[in-house]
Amino acid sequence: MKKQCFFEFASVFASSMSFILSILREMLEYFGVPINQILHIWENKDYGSARSIVRIIGKLLPLEPCPRPNFELVPLLNSVDPANCGSVVPSFADVWCVANDEEASYLRFRTWKNEEEEKIASFHPLQLFEGPLTPAVRRNKPRKNDWPESETAIKKIAALEDELAFLRSQIAAIVGRQELGNSTKAGFLDLNGRPSGFGQKPSSGATQLNVKQDSFSSSVRPSSPPPPSPPQISSVQPPCSPLMKIASNSICASDNSTTEVKQQHPDAGKTNYSHHSKNQKNEAVPNMLDVLKDMNKVKLRAIERSPGGRPIHKRKREDSPWDPVSLISHALKQKFAFQEEDSFEKEDNCWESSPFSSPETSRVRL
């Protein structure tokens, strides 16, 4: 029973397939297409296995192609030479020119490229558009549509730079004046051969002169204010008044008397100066409680190191000797070096070391 049903189904399927094949043959004969040509194309499979038989038949049939849509474009009204615009009907071939162009891509077609290649390279003042460029030339070509920087920002930056230069020049002038004053003061001390005001023991003549001068000043000024700080010595000296002349004469007389006392008692000045220097050293020693109180606030500086662990030393740039920054740094170094020479650790400053390293000791063989 099953075999009989199967045979009936196979006969129906074969009859239907034969009917379909007969219909296809009749259609091909009606259109004048030989069946041998279709079988040859099907066996070769020029278009692969995905090529459908409907496409093959449609290609072989003498059918008229469908009309393609044409997009009509209005030519440019402000164009200088409208005859050179080329075809105004775009197609898919124009996509490459549009994608590779950055300026006015909607006004350029593929036909313009050939025309630009044929023309001689010349500049026309009324030429509005240029031909398409290659990608290499386009990368090297500077952009024309870059927005300029705001003028207000440029003006602010220029004003800040001018103000900074003015401040640097002022600081350099102040430091120069201070160096000049220090040099003149050092020359004055060298001429006297001793620091003024230290270890002087006035004689009887000097005391009499001082008493006379005090009485004269008290008659002129009834209440004398506390002595002011010594002013800085400037290069331009004011005109001397009679009071200044009298004071200078008294100072010269006191200097002569003190020199005589020094010749008679040479050890007195040394003892007084040593006593004063000891007092100054004791006052300069800081209190350890104040130092230890701020130990928790100390922050170490991060040091850049190489992969091997050695610290990296930055190269010192060579500055001009007239640079304000170099002048200021040089003056500060001289100032702090002068202070370190007068410090109580003068005998221990024989080497230069970091504040975290221990002093090097010389090894003596026994």
Swiss-Prot record:
Q: Which UniProt keywords apply?
A: Coiled coil, Mitochondrion, Phosphoprotein
Q: Which domain of life is it from?
A: Eukaryota
In this UniProt entry, which cysteines form S-S bonds?
none
- Which Pfam family, just one, is annotated for this protein? Mito_fiss_reg
Q: Which residues form a coiled coil?
A: 149-177
Subcellular localization: Mitochondrion
Q: Which GO terms describe its cellular component?
A: mitochondrion
Q: Is Phosphoprotein tagged as a keyword?
A: yes
**Skewed-composition ranges (Polar residues):** 201-214, 351-366
Give the residue ranges for region: Disordered: 191-240, 255-281, 305-324, 345-366
Phosphoserine: residues carrying this PTM: S306, S343
Its BP terms in the Gene Ontology are: aerobic respiration; mitochondrial fission
Subcellular location, principal: mitochondrion
By sequence similarity, the record places it as follows: Belongs to the MTFR1 family.
What does the record give as the function of this protein?
A: May play a role in mitochondrial aerobic respiration essentially in the testis. Can also promote mitochondrial fission.
Supply the name of the protein.
Mitochondrial fission regulator 2
